[in-house]
Amino acid sequence: MKQLTLGMVAHVDAGKTTLSESLLYTTGTIKHQGRVDHKDTFLDYNTQERERGITIFSKVSSLDYKNNHFTFIDTPGHADFSGEMERALSVLDYAIVIINGLDGVQAHTKTIWNLLEHYHVPAFIFVNKMDLTHYTKEELLDSLSQLSPHIMDMSASEEDIAALDEEMIEEYLETGSLKDTSIAKAISNRHLYPLYFGSALKNQGVDELLDALDRYTLEKEPQTELSAQVFKITRDERGERLVFIKVTGGRLHVRDTIHDEKIHQIRLYQGNRYTLVEEASQNDIVALTGIKKLQAGDYIGLGHVIHSTLRPSMLYSIQPSKEADINHFFSSLKVLGEEEPLLHLKLFDDHAQVSLMGEVQIDILKQLMKDRFNEDITVDEGEVAYLETIKEPVEGVGHFEPLRHYSEVHLYFCLLYTSPSPRDGATS
């Protein structure tokens, strides 16, 4: 059975969670198809998510379709929670990019696309809400072309599809047709981004998308040596620390030791429910308990640390209430700082400083501190997070002394410095 990890990514209100719900319902994984506006979807079970109608935290679910086991990570679509989305990208085999057919490509869509390029994630595209849009498929495809010229409506002719990849061109010229494996290879190499249209709410186009995921995806070669990537730290309802990983090679077992810490449990999550398993093998997405040292972006065995490319633009000072215990205030923030590393938490004598993306994230931070730790906090108006760097090329001379001889090294640092161009009467 082919086993893959797929990520649901989109700008806010594109219908990403609705598509996740439709995929689970269509395959018989869930019996009731919830709706975001009814506040009863399978994956948005957090109270704040249901009240706001947006995804705040990434969720894991899985389904079986034909000879495939697909694990889906439903990620936040709101720009304020882009860090949570980016961390999931490091463990994806493929992304499903959902576009709102009413809007086309949005600014955050471009951010997502750039991140997919950074992490080398191949993608399928699903244009949603086609039952409501006044745009034609051709107009929407024209909008999508600003992301890549390799996006192709899969209802096009095989000749048009083949034109996007040299190997497919050769095959088509020789045989007059294309094999599914050839199309799958082009997608995996990011020479082709298949495009589908439909309505997730009405389950239109969902069967076609599932069929494409079956026919046009490839599984990575088996790896025997242990390797795993950490992409999420969170806590369960009892406060148990959960380390979400994707096993990319070998096997992990309960009671195995990682950095002198023993794995207590291996949990296989389906929404907010989980099953305890004794081991996890390649391509499994699981949560570990008993592990305190690993952080988001870390790895187990073979691999490398993943660093976020995103940087929040604002710094905020956070004050506890007058009645608060300062140590409890700090320890509570440390928990949230583990779960969202982009907070870049700094602690001072009587307050803390965090980096945040926007107003919605501020509101959620306040609510999390109240709901989870019974802490009332005050957040100031914030200031721009400036980054300091050199303006001009400089030459530095450094010396190092190997065992047998004296050496001198000249280092030349060069940074292109530019100032903003005048715009709307402003001066740089």
Predicted regions and their residues:
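Active-site phosphate-binding and catalytic loops of NTP-dependent enzymes
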Residues: 30-36, 43-57, 150-154, 216-225, ...
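C-terminal polymerase-core module
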Residues: 383-419
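Single conserved hydrophobic/aromatic residue that forms the stacking wall/gate
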Residues: 417-428
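C-terminal effector modules of nucleic-acid-centric enzymes and ribosome-associated factors
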Residues: 272-393
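P-loop NTPase catalytic nucleotide-binding module
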Residues: 1-14, 32-33, 101-237, 257-258, ...
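Conserved nucleotide-binding/hydrolysis modules and their immediate coupling elements
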Residues: 216, 224-315
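P-loop NTPase switch module centered on the Walker A-proximal segment
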Residues: 1-91, 95-99, 105, 139, ...
